[in-house]
Amino acid sequence: MKNTQRQLSSSFMKFLEEKNRDLEAVFAYMDANRDGRISAEELKKSFKTLGEQMSDEEAEAAVKLSDIDGDGMLDINEFALLIKGNDEFTEEEKKRKIMEAFRMYIADGEDCITPGSLKMMLMKLGESRTTDDCKVMIQAFDLNADGVLSFDEFALMMR
């Protein structure tokens, strides 16, 4: 269970360190059915979107870890508790992992994440998203409003 929390922490904590709005954005993205709660299945699918594998048992354990009210789901406060585990990576390791993730989402010959490359990667991961969905996802972190994510923008999003 500690390994599951560490895995969740390393993948999602980078997303959430900047501001509370990042937490809300990640939560909203993971809450696929928009009911204000994240189920173990939604957690597992979102994890897969980030290029990580999570078993049904790990997803259930992760939800139970922070499910304060015992409803089998995570509200935004419980989700915040889940991801606040110890982040044991050095800055160099964090940057390397972020670069590895970034490379997964860029098309050959490109140096940025485009709506098309994001859509393609999500399809490979079993997530069906429209190009418009991908544009919205990119827009949330596109600091210079050029319609794509540079490595620096991606790194800020992941921290």
UniProtKB/Swiss-Prot annotation:
| Biological processes annotated in GO | cellular response to hypoxia
**Residues where Ca(2+) 1 binds:** 31, 33, 35, 37, 42
Matches recorded under SUPFAM superfamilies: EF-hand
Q: Which residues form the EF-hand domain?
A: 18-53, 54-89, 93-128, 129-159
Keywords from UniProt, A to Z, are: Calcium, Metal-binding, Repeat
Q: Which GO terms describe its molecular function?
A: calcium ion binding
Q: What does the entry list as the binding residues for Ca(2+) 3?
A: 142, 144, 146, 153
Coiled-coil regions, chain positions: none
Residues binding Ca(2+) 2: 67, 69, 71, 73, 78
Q: Does the keyword Nucleotide-binding apply?
A: no
Disulphide bond pairs: none
Q: What is this protein called?
A: Calcium-binding protein CML39
Biological classification of the source: Eukaryota, Viridiplantae, Streptophyta, Embryophyta, Tracheophyta
